[in-house]
Design a protein with these regions (language model features):
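Signature of Gram-negative outer-membrane beta-barrel scaffolds
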Residues: 1-14, 37
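Residue-level signature of outer-membrane beta-barrel architecture
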Residues: 6-9, 22, 66, 125-127, ...
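Membrane-embedded beta-strand positions of outer-membrane beta-barrel proteins
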Residues: 4, 18, 62, 76-78, ...
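Transmembrane beta-barrel architecture of outer membranes
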Residues: 3, 47, 171-175
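Membrane-embedded beta-barrel scaffold of Gram-negative outer-membrane proteins
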Residues: 15-17, 21, 25-27, 31, ...
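Short beta-alpha connecting loops at secondary-structure transitions
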Residues: 44-50
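Outer-membrane beta-barrel translocator domains and adjoining extracellular loop/strand segments
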Residues: 29-35, 42-44, 86-93, 133-135, ...
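Gram-negative outer-membrane beta-barrel transporters
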Residues: 80-82, 100-182
Length: 182
């Protein structure tokens, strides 16, 4: 699928990157198979969906990176993603199938379209700026803020709720680690 990647070396320590990409994610084969899996012990049924469409996304990213003279960097970026036909598991209760009622029914569905916008910040630095003996010890941390909004939510029995966020898309994520080399 098409993509455009641009990098501008402002100077030796400062880089700006931008990109547009289109990506396609096909459904898992197990989700496409028109199979029926009945778990009698829990009275659950799972049915595949051969009608699933691939998820297509249009992605715009812009970032700026500053590299320290010693090992490390600070980076900030923004992103926007338009996602079409994302897939989630639709779960229903008291579902009737071939004359039996099951307490839980699960089937993958194309749930609709979503827009995602966010900010990413990251920082990595060894501690040699404190003391040269600490050149093999460092810190790495990231923070991401994401706002998502689902449009055209396609679930049976549910209305398109206002300001519904995309499933599996947390608003805040962060990671931090200390590292050392041997």
């Amino acid at each position: 699928l098409p993509s455009l990647l641009v990098k501008w070396n402002v100077n030796d320590d400062f880089k700006v990157r931008g990109s547009f990409t289109q990506t396609l994610s096909r459904p898992k084969y197990s989700a496409l198979v028109p199979s029926v899996n009945i778990k009698r012990s829990d009275n659950e049924i799972t049915i595949g969906n051969p009608e699933l469409k691939p998820t297509v996304s249009y992605n715009f990213d812009l970032s700026a990176d500053y590299y320290f003279r010693s090992i490390g960097l600070i980076s900030a970026g923004i992103f926007y993603k338009k996602i079409d036909d994302f897939i989630v598991d639709q779960v229903s209760t008291n579902y009737e199938y071939q004359g039996n009622t099951y307490t839980r029914f699960t089937q993958p569905k194309n749930a609709g379209n979503a827009n995602l916008v966010g900010v990413e910040l990251s920082y990595q630095r060894d501690f040699s700026f404190i003391a040269p003996a600490l050149k093999c010890v460092g810190f790495y941390g990231t923070y991401t803020y994401t706002h998502s909004r689902v449009e055209d939510f396609n679930f049976e029995g549910r209305e398109n709720e206002k300001d519904l966020s995309m499933p599996g898309s947390p608003e805040h994520t962060a990671n931090a680690s200390l590292y050392f080399c041997l």
